[in-house]
Amino acid sequence: MNRGDIFAKEFDTDPDVSTDSNYNNNNNSNNNNSIISNSNNNNNNNNNNVDDTDIEKHLYKVLLIGDYAVGKSSIIKRYCTGIFSPNYKLTIGVDFSVKDIEWEKNKIVSLQLWDIAGHERFGTMTRVYYRYAIAAIIVFDLSRPSTFDAVTKWREDVNSKVVLANQEPIPVLLLANKSDLSTSYVDSEMLDRFCKENNFIGWFATSASNDTNINEAMHFLTKEILEVAKTNHPPKPEEDTLELTKTNGEKSDDSKSCCK
């Protein structure tokens, strides 16, 4: 997949995947593997320019969780915009961005990336934030061992609050972030063993600062999501959906943090 095939956008509507006006929910056998999808393939279209209605679209909600200041926001910003800034204000509650991927001809896969605050005072809201997610990423900071110690806590939190339609756990990817720092050390054998013991689908050493393994990790997760979505699609949203206001990437005026 060429980088030129990847582009990013943000929705101008409520981030709840159940209410996005850009996608229509078609529950047919060929198109029941995404949260919201729109497929109207025209095999007789001989035009070189493909109309938007001929493009198959799938939207998937993905959680990014982990302790505060591990770099979740920086990873999302790097992936969605290609930009890194050393100074970020801490996420308050939840933020979100959407990344559109031209996965194959006439097929767009959109990842709705939910940036969940890592502060304990927001822990009571995670059940609401996790709703309808099809996958998750847990991030820890290689330069702060305590953030790795918390990974198991976050994994258990996900397991207890969100599952696939068949009641199996959602796929979870582990990111060992800030690999560019001189104080960072990656024990590959230990992480391989840890992921196997705790049912992670895999792990990547990443750096938003140096753009290391960000696209590779997301591509790996997207492949897993598409495989899972063949037989599992999230349940229909209930009426008591969470109302959020799109922030356009702006953070609150809390203390600044350097998150690579």
UniProtKB/Swiss-Prot annotation:
Database matches in CDD domains: Rab32_Rab38 (cd04107)
Where is motif Effector region found?
88-96
The organism's place on the tree of life at top rank: Eukaryota
Sequence intervals crossing the membrane: none
Q: Where is this region: Disordered?
A: 11-50, 231-260
Record Pfam families: Ras
Q: Supply one GO molecular-function term.
A: GTPase activity
Q: Which GO terms describe its biological process?
A: intracellular protein transport; melanosome organization; vesicle-mediated transport
Q: At which positions is GTP bound?
A: 66-73, 115-119, 177-180
Q: Name one GO cellular component term.
A: trans-Golgi network
Q: Which family does it belong to?
A: Belongs to the small GTPase superfamily. Rab family.
Q: What is this protein called?
A: Ras-related protein Rab-32B
- Recite the lineage of the species: Eukaryota, Amoebozoa, Evosea, Eumycetozoa, Dictyostelia
Q: Which gene encodes it?
A: rab32B
